[in-house]
Amino acid sequence: VDNFGTGYGPDSSTDHQKQRTKTSQALAKINADIYALVEIQTGQGALAELAADLTKNTGRNFAYINDGSVTDGSFTKSGYIYCTDKVTPHGNMQHNDTYVENRKKVQGFTEKASGEQFILSVNHFKAKSGSGSGANKDQGDGQGSYNAARVQEAKSILSNYSSYTSTFGDEDFLIVGDLNAYGKEDPITT
């Protein structure tokens, strides 16, 4: 979800509504039970709107997980919307604020039909763009700027794996999101 919100993103309420409608319709077509979203702007407000729209557009019941962060602001975050008919979140959402806040979150879920549990980690690693310095400077190896930061973010997820599996009581762990790296780049092979 790119630039969804008010105050930071669309320039007017008309643009906001167009973007909201387009995004909601696209999500409804995916027909998922859980949406792990990145690039959410205006925080809880955007998640609440999308959950309400999904409920309206699909006839299924959707909710979002309130992570307790502020509603408005010029920031992006990650978050979860889930179908309450199919899954239930369990445990308290864990935040991993290594390098960039509000963009790496971990939540346990239980599938209602089977009782199976799993852990879903939604992430949005630092972008390759910009002009980093030191280890974050573009090294000319095709991985772009801030590769060291992305590696640090990946290592942070791995180093907290045991904590997450203990917290949520399960070892089925799925990492999703925008890692801003290709399959053979350092953040993925770490």
Where do the protein language model's features map onto the residues?
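Divalent cation-coordinating acidic motifs and surrounding scaffolds
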Residues: 1-190
